[in-house]
Amino acid sequence: MITVDRVESTQDWNEFKAVTDLVYQGDPYRLPDEPMDLDRILISPPVAIASTRDIAAFLARENGVVVGRVVAIHDTSFTQYTGESIGFFGFYEAVDDHEVATGLLDAAAAWLAARGLGAMSGPFGPSMFYSAGIVVDDEPALPLVGMPHNPLYYAAHFEKWGLVGIKDFYSYLFDDPCVIYNRPEYARHMQIFEKIKARSEVTFRSMKYRTVRRDARIVRDLYNKTFVNFWGFSPLSFVELFELLKMMLPVLDRRLTLLAELDGKPVGFLMGIPDVNQAAAKAAHLKSRWLRDLVTLWHVKKPSRTDVIDGVRVDMLFVDPDCPDRAVSSLLIMELSVRMRDLGYTRVEAAPVLDDSPWMKGSVLTRMEQTPHRTYRIYNRDLELPRP
């Protein structure tokens, strides 16, 4: 018999975290630890974040054994900004049983509908800024750092329940970070970029640990200006961005975090994240969480890190739309690729990229014969509101 109950106690939360051990048992690409710190982003987030987001977590049990989980999310800041009556679900994990899936999704939908929300979208973890969608590729692979990983049957769970895919986004893999310029047909583009760089007054600097708060505010402002017209946008708060940066700092290489400035004013930002999952996979066999973290960080920080971590995820390309220099995005990409080459990285993956986003339409990806390496999907379903 399947039962679904709301998470209430510390023991419930411990069982919530343990669901992944059951779901991913035998998955060769599964990493033993959650990609996000659930305590900091879900269970006990900072007050400033908790005040803008109401959640209800649910556990599914079969004969007393936990077999699935889900979180219903009412992002009040999103509702207030967009005026849209949409709730979200996320952190979905379940065994391959449609009765379990139905029970979990029914519970999340009922909670959102009771709050007057007319649709449910997801999965988000807990918002689009952190993690969004599920992998829908037929070929499983080691997840890219910060991106989703899930059993392929999740799509069937969602679709059978009535969720419909509403947005796809992709990652693009380049086995050589300078492939854009090394291909003969792009030699001319490289010459153009060099000429633009020579006459451009745009300068670059890396984010600094001692000024991370100030730089976080700069990145927040650039994000909110850049993505204001993007699908699913709502303004990002400083607290939320800063919390994410704090979680990422141990694995970031600040030489790959670029701020572009023009006349002393910030006009762009681009971040490359070393694919720490490659190091985490090396430590996955260890039983102790702290030992896994220690070994992973050792691989991340050692001088010969690229022996294990040869890849970089390119994320967070923000350019001030009011910047008079229209070459900033190209210059940022070129500068990052040169730094990756000099540091010894030989693989780069750009993700997430919306296929219909303004950035995609204007980016160098549209001028390349490049097909998506991975596909992620977000789903939606209208809800029936309870009668008065």
Which role does the model predict for each range below?
Residues 148-230:
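Acyltransferase donor/substrate-recognition loop-hinge adjacent to the catalytic core
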Residues 2-3:
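Extreme N-terminal starter segment of soluble prokaryotic enzymes
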Residues 81-167, 287-365:
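Acyl-donor binding region in acyl/amide transferases
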Residues 231, 256-261, 268-270, 278-284, ...:
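Extended hydrophobic-aromatic, low-complexity segments
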Residues 33-147, 251, 261-262, 266-279, ...:
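Conserved donor-binding loop and adjoining core beta-sheet/short helix segment
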Residues 20-62, 70-80, 206, 211-317:
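A conserved beta-strand-loop-helix scaffold within acyl/acetyltransferase catalytic domains
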